[in-house]
């Protein structure tokens, strides 16, 4: 009995407790032609994700800014885009409480040469759409992160 307890204690103290798993890293680029280079990727539920959006274009933010807004499954991109388009002073991110609930994560708006990284964990399986919320961009700048069960 004492040996079993001793073995258990040694195992507990020898194992790093609370060791954080490094996030899986993805990079998506966007450009002056209003496209993302990727339409999506797949992760496992509970996996920490670090996503970098890099604007490889040359046009400045004021003229051709892009972002990446990750939304909850089932969110209508057309409806979300309509509300986002009215929010220029807020980086084209809706501010009403109901619509804000649909946002999982969002990068800053980026001009040519800029980049931003967001880190998030998607715990529930499903298809999480993402889009650029700059008016007129969502129809061609969208994709899906598919989350598979563990």
In which residue ranges do the predicted regions lie?
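Sec/Tat signal peptide C-region and signal peptidase I cleavage site
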Residues: 16-21
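Short edge-strand/loop segments of extracellular domains
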Residues: 68-78, 138, 147-150
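Extracytoplasmic beta-sandwich strand-turn segments characteristic of Greek-key/jelly-roll folds
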Residues: 75-124
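Extracellular/periplasmic metallocenter environments
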Residues: 35, 105-150
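Beta-strand cores of secreted/periplasmic/IMS beta-sandwich domains, seen most often
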Residues: 40-62, 70, 116-124, 129, ...
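Sec-dependent N-terminal signal peptides
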Residues: 4-15
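Extracytoplasmic/periplasmic beta-strand context in beta-sandwich domains
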Residues: 66-67, 143
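N-terminal edge beta-strand
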Residues: 23-49
